[in-house]
Amino acid sequence: PAFGTTLIIEEKLRQIGIQTEKYNTTCPFVEKVWNRSEAIAKKNYSIIIHGKPKHEETRATFSHAANNAASVVVKDMDEAKELAKYITGEKDAANFYTEFKNQFSEGFDVKKDLQRIGVVNQTTMLASDTQAIADYLKQVMIDSFPNDNPEEHFADTRDTLCYATNDNQTAVSGMLQTDADLAIVVGGYNSSNTSHLVELCEEKLPTYFINNEEKILSAKEILHHNFHTKEELLTNDFLPAKYPVKILVTSGASCPDAL
């Protein structure tokens, strides 16, 4: 799959005779994250992964990262701030293993493995959120080790952010500066990056998340997905009673342009 897979699954495929290198469909941006994780691991940095702990891509990235270095997953800025408290010593190291249960690599040593870190992400997370987490943790390291060069404790991984996802997010943010009546977002209902675009639009406009043109039933009715509740909803009179109507349309990073 585009988001890659875990080393355990790769090994199972090899055991049954499937030559995975001949069928490699992993997104190059995901592989770039893996390669950078391996590179900074060789320099004795631990890997902080910004992602949804149960998402397939995050699980794959965690598997590859943990094979080379101590690794931990943070799902958002709130978790990053809690992780920072273990760096600064504000929290008892023993509590880490409960607070971040199932989100850290085997043998993770809180006192040792948070001295040198680098941040990578699930490529479909908001790039701005990942950058904010990286900037925050970098400042924590600077404050914690004021007499050292920042690079001694924090690896620069900015160039691992996926430009396809980042470009979409930046374009949508710019688009939302335009006065409009509603937004339609097209993409897969299980797509993480598309759901982030929906979130951006929902902050400003009535937003309808659809996966194909057939969901627009008429000028009056639209079937759309509520990704918060995982329900499909039918909305009547979704178009305002005015003319002209200004509609913002965007789509997820992997959505075919023809849609």
Where are these regions (language model features)?
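The feature marks the mature, well-folded catalytic cores of soluble enzymes
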Residues: 1-259
